[in-house]
A protein has these predicted regions:
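Conserved catalytic core of the tyrosine transesterase superfamily
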Residues: 1-310
Length: 310
């Protein structure tokens, strides 16, 4: 499975997630080999997740995609009819959105890299993993753009680079260059390159432009190759920093890193930008995904005068 996952350009995280779901599927069916099972067993497992484990629709879809990968890509079963699965219910939850003042207050409570990353989440609409995976070459200071490479959906997109972040980002890249120079001096400095680019461009892995904008403090072993490399900062560090900032700022919302992205979209719509523009900046394939923010705009009767107020 590992070789096929790498050939299909699955991220390491997706590969591990699929492997865990396939393992659960096998154990659910008494440790029988998947090739000895069929669509009926897949239906039973997915229905079990919805009915007995009460998983969310997104979790059930994740399991479905893992099994689809197993049968179509690994076992080469093109015909796999799994109609009739009991689907988990989609909960219609509105996203948590910060006010502009709240977003600014939260960012002000954060320090160093975490503050800069939060600024990119809110100012550029990045997902947390898109932010921590940014490479030096993805930032275009001259054009005021950020290229989001192969984000969710395997499609590159362009979003804005906030003017207020240009100077702190330049300072961050100076730190990265110094760290990279030191790594090279010690015999390291090669970074993971996606899609077998390392085999195509032998020396690219050590080029500064491919380095992460937010590198980890310590070197670590790459689980793909066993080589010692410098990975990017952990997204969990940023998540914890956001939770701490929420508490210190006294903001009583169940916010997270993704709330900055929600706020980015909502505030653009409030400022009069059209939904298609926001869709492109967010990288949504379907405009219906972006439409959820119009519900946030209308929440609480916003824009409608209460009869109690005369």
């Amino acid at each position: 499975m590992t070789d096929i996952a790498r050939f299909r350009h699955l991220s390491l995280r997706t590969e591990e997630t699929y492997r865990n779901w396939i393992k659960r599927y096998i154990f659910f069916n008494g440790k029988r080999h998947p090739k000895d099972l069929n669509a009926e067993h897949v239906r039973a497992f997915l229905t079990h997740l919805a009915v007995n484990e009460h998983v969310s629709a997104s979790t059930q879809n994740q399991a479905f995609n893992a099994l689809l990968f197993l049968y179509r890509q690994v076992l080469q079963w093109e015909a796999l009819d799994i109609q009739g699965v009991e689907r988990a219910r989609h909960s219609r939850r509105l996203p948590v959105v910060f006010t502009k003042a709240e977003a600014s207050a939260l960012i002000a409570q954060m320090n160093d890299e975490n503050r800069l990353i939060a600024g990119l989440l809110y100012g550029s609409g990045l997902r947390i993993m898109e932010a921590v995976r940014l490479r030096v070459k993805d930032i275009d200071f001259a054009r005021g753009e950020i290229i989001v490479r192969d984000g969710k959906g395997e499609q590159d997109r362009v979003t804005m680079l906030p003017q207020t972040l240009k100077h702190p980002l330049s300072e961050q890249l100076a730190v990265v260059r110094e760290l990279h120079t030191d790594d090279l001096r010690r015999g390291y400095g090669a970074i993971y390159l996606p899609y077998a680019l390392e085999r195509k461009y032998k020396n690219a892995a050590k080029d500064f432009v491919w380095q992460y904008v937010f590198p980890a403090d310590k070197l670590s072993i790459d689980p793909r190759t066993g080589e010692i490399r410098r990975h990017h900062i952990s997204e969990q560090n940023v998540q914890r920093a956001v939770k701490t900032a929420l508490r210190i700022a006294g903001i009583k919302k169940n916010g997270s890193c993704h709330s900055f992205r929600h706020s980015f979209a909502t505030h653009l719509l409030e400022d009069g930008y059209d939904i298609r523009t926001v869709q492109e900046l967010l990288g949504h394939k379907d405009v219906r995904t972006t439409m959820i923010y119009t519900h946030v705009l209308n929440r609480g009767g916003r824009g409608v005068r209460s009869p109690l107020d005369g």
